Amino acid sequence: MANDFLFTSESVSEGHPDKVADQISDAILDAVFKQDPHARVAAETLTNTGLVVLAGEITALPEVNVDYIQIARDTLKRIGYDNTEYGIDYKGCAVMVCYDKQSKDIAQGVDHASDDHLNTGAGDQGLMFGYACDETPELMPAPIYYAHRLVERQAQLRKDGRLPFLRPDAKSQVTMRYVDGKPHSIDTVVLSTQHSPDQSETPHKMKASFIEAVIEEIIKPVLPKEWLQNTRYLINPTGRFVIGGPQGDCGLTGRKIIVDTYGGACPHGGGAFSGKDPSKVDRSAAYAARYVAKNIVAAGLARQCQIQVAYAIGVAKPMNVTVYTEGTGVIPDEKLSALVQEHFDLRPNGIIQMLDLLRPIYEKTAAYGHFGRDEPEFTWEKTDKAALLRAAAGF
């Protein structure tokens, strides 16, 4: 990539229909894990006008008793879907439950790996990526980091009553200008937020007071002032946005995988996270790859780092562990790959133990990004191996 360029990432709010589905799926995973942390869960959710459908596979101890319908309603309530005017109301919506158990054919390979019978095998084949860079203190790419913060603030101001005309659904997009390969300024901010009907002058034009409130109360308090140089603001650029959430679009678990990760700054293996227990390497190995990449950057061994891992179903050991630093590493990438394999156990059991993943910690991950957040449950954000890696690299 050229040294001077524009790069864009987007995020969506907790009230976006796909994120509603993600949060319900992870709330159900957490509820099952509270009673059986070794359960196998693949919880999928569909949301539409007045309807939630819960499907997938859950295998747990016989004594596990989870009120799936109530969890779906509680999640809708927390997000803010508490009024029939919004197209879905936690009190009156229909909730269908259609769970099966995990296939025995899959379970036999996960329970005992073909290459190591003392370890569990990967729950599926696939490839996963982790990434870190020095653009922000959180070691995340700046565009996705700030896109998340915008919709997070939209929800905060909606819920605390400071901007009472806001409704749950919203999307943000940040276009960053890079100079010499580093963030220089923000070229464009797009923020589209659902609102009460009185905020538009015409179907195609928002009130000036609405636009001013969004810019002054949501956008400017979040973005670094030094980056707001001739920045263009596009606020509800199509105009009226009253119909939103599951009424505006059908929501499905796993449809916001780039929002969930790095905003397009690195490749994605294609597997979604929400609703999946950590025996599914789609989730756990992606978390581990972030942990590895972040520790490499925190150690000062590279300014940016991309990790690829790949697995075969029923096999514990990864097919490959590959490090790319795009020329920013202080030692060759192949030496970094060797260090990673020496100091990180990337077998499924190793990941679960290393990151303490058999806990009900997942609902919080399902909105505003799985990475780059300072939450005590997010063990994959620790940089506790940075000093070890630096010493092992000879620094």
UniProtKB/Swiss-Prot annotation:
It catalyses: L-methionine + ATP + H2O = S-adenosyl-L-methionine + phosphate + diphosphate. It is an enzyme of class 2 (transferase). InterPro entries: ADOMET_SYNTHASE_CS, S-AdoMet_synt_C, S-AdoMet_synt_central, S-AdoMet_synt_N, S-AdoMet_synthetase, S-AdoMet_synthetase_sfam. PROSITE patterns: ADOMET_SYNTHASE_1, ADOMET_SYNTHASE_2. The keyword Metal-binding applies. K(+) binds at residue 44. It comes from the Bacteria. It is found in: Cytoplasm. Its EC number is 2.5.1.6. Residues 102-112 are annotated as: Flexible loop. L-methionine binds at residues 57, 102, 249, 280. One of its GO terms (biological process) is S-adenosylmethionine biosynthetic process. ATP binds at residues 16, 169-171, 240-241, 249, 255-256, 272, 276. One of its GO terms (molecular function) is magnesium ion binding. Its cofactor is Mg(2+); K(+). Binds 2 divalent ions per subunit. Binds 1 potassium ion per subunit. Belongs to the AdoMet synthase family. Catalyzes the formation of S-adenosylmethionine (AdoMet) from methionine and ATP. The overall synthetic reaction is composed of two sequential steps, AdoMet formation and the subsequent tripolyphosphate hydrolysis which occurs prior to release of AdoMet from the enzyme. PANTHER family: S-ADENOSYLMETHIONINE SYNTHETASE. Homotetramer; dimer of dimers. This is S-adenosylmethionine synthase.
